[in-house]
Amino acid sequence: MKKLFYTFMSVIALCEFVPTSAFAQKQYDLETAQPDTTKQNYHLIDGVEISTVRKLVSNNAVSSQLNNKTIERSLGQSLGTMLERVSGVSSIQTGGTVSKPVIHGMYGNRILLVNNGARLTGQQWGADHAPEVDKNSSTKIEVVKGAEAVRYGSDALGGIVVMEQDMLPYNQKHTHGRLLSMYGSNGYRYQFVGHAEGSMPFLPSLAWRIQATYANSGDQRAAHYLLNNTGTREFDFSTALGYQHKNFRAEGYLSRYDLKLGVLYNAQMGDADLLAERIKIGRPVDITPYTRHIDYPFQHIVHTNATLKLYYNTEKYGDFYWLASFQKDDREENRIRRMNLSYIPAVSMHLKTLQNYLRWRKYYGDWQTEVGTQVVNSNHSNQRGTGVVPIIPNHTENQIGAYALQKYQNNRLGAELGVRFDWQDTKAAGYDWTGDYYGGHRTFSNFTYSLGAHYHATDKLTLTTNFGLAWRAPHVFELYSNGNELGTGRFVRGDSTMCSENSYKWVVSTEYRSTVLDARLDAYLQWVKHYIYDRPMKGEYVTVISGTYPLFQYMQTDVFIRGIDFDLRLRPLSAIEYHIVSSMIWANETRTHNYLPYIPSFRINHSLTYTPHLSGKAFAPWIEVKHRFVARQTRFNAASDLIAYAPASYSLFGLEAGTEWRIDTHNTLSLFVSADNIFNKEYKEYTNRARYYAHDLGRDIRLTIGWKF
């Protein structure tokens, strides 16, 4: 009975693996961003370290971590593509330039991005809108696979991507940093990243950090043809300044993300017959020579973030933390327009957001109490004089939330209970293409809770479980949209009568770790009431001045989602490691049992890495061979899709190799070569919204050179 009791408790513990404890257990608080010194330091070439924290305290979140080396080796890739290294994470794409992370089938507004402690409040509601953040400004990225809604509020139904920097280098004598340069063959693109940090010599308790990224790309290629007008220009920078004195710390952070990207010509023009022909052919018909020039149509996004964080530890009465963040997001979309009007943006949207977060936390013995409140105010406006009816109306959103968490932790067992209340007020107003006024005033509110626990059955085996309720109010885009998306080549229509989503998610995880074998199995069940999705309306098209587009209608249904994630590392020899990651997911409407659209199919990634042990420590070379298999998606509703069949299954092979040369104590040079789709396979990914018009990217060889000082 005792053994049965421990087994049962370990299963309950797995619940806690996901949401609320994700960061408390690792001492990975958003205001401190402390580097994890207890992480097992395996040489992981693909960089995925799945909860490698080995502490006496519990690890209460089903999470995976990408370290700084992984981020550096992913130079030239999008955030969504890089996160695909994690089991249970895929991406939904729009061509080769826009990629959004998908966690357990959830994406968009159901995935919360936290950058340097603040919720990223950009315009990510569109399928052709990627997260407006520079991944190179982070040194650690944590993927939490669960409804982490108690601590962070609504919109975290699917999971959270936490992007953090290291602690500012207080009392550091020398200036440290890194320089990285990358060249990629696909698009003949190049990228530079610079980073430096230190503390003031006249005041060591005053620390600083600066970082910048520049990227330039021309037309990208599928396996056998060019994807015209898919070039990009990106320039990002961030800076931080902090002061620390005894138990008090104040830090300011400023960043700017600036991206201009071209949109594939093929999806933008033509009548209904030409549209049907393009979808039938499935690739561009007219292809022009390669160019770096970005022509119409294109998108231009600028996101500015200014954040202030104050932290004070009273020791006796606990610690207090306050965060204030102002974010401004400007998005312009220029299309091919008649009468030489293409220079005027057809879409010019501006979003301003102010968020405040206050938290109190107290440790006493094996217990911890945490109470917090959050206020978010958003104002979205459309630029006048564009000559085009905005796809969404002007709107404001005001959100207020408060939560409480109670945790218990000893050497083997941990448990947690959390509850939260959120209230949201949304006002929208605009005029449609007929000149009629539309919009409205909607109010949403909901309670959220989470109950979880974990249990260290042995020093090598950990069981975790969590059951939680999360919710999300419909976005204004889902309620009132009535226009065509530039990047996806589709016309989207909202439904103003929709109500909020409510989700129940149960996650169970079993993890085993030894010197030879690391294995983890995650299983999850998720019920979502009033699930919102955009359904392709087969045979229905909308014709506007710029062309004819397939109609996608937002609607609601109750769904049941379940799946399994598997991650295994085998080290038969000290210099050899085999790594395999696989995921399966099923998603159905509960009433009709129809499959949901755009759910990732079964996939498996595996790699073999060789790291020779050289006598000297100056060089650290390694080489890796990798393979990805993605099955044909058979679990989709062919009757409602634009195409009655899903793309064929495909296999992609790759190769990575590199070395580091430690010149002295402070200087290290690195060289990294990566080849993706090395055999130049022509394929289409089911979750790519541009698959109706073009294939995915062909072979890409990247060379990265770095210097740390």
Tell me what each language-model feature is.
Residues 26-72, 80:
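Short, acidic, small-residue-rich periplasmic hinge/interaction motif at the N-terminus
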Residues 119-146, 170:
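Short acidic/polar hinge/loop motifs at secondary-structure boundaries
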Residues 160, 165-200, 212, 227:
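Short strand-turn segments of transmembrane beta-barrel domains in outer membranes
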Residues 162, 199-296:
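Periplasmic-side early beta-strands and strand-to-turn transitions of outer-membrane beta-barrels
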Residues 244-258, 290-450, 454-456, 461, ...:
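Face-selective signature of the C-terminal outer-membrane beta-barrel domain
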Residues 344-359, 401, 493-499, 505, ...:
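Outer membrane beta-barrel strand-and-loop segments of large Gram-negative receptors
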Residues 471-472, 527-529, 534, 629-636, ...:
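C-terminal beta-signal and adjacent terminal beta-strands/loops
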Residues 524-527, 545-634:
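Gram-negative outer-membrane beta-barrel transporters
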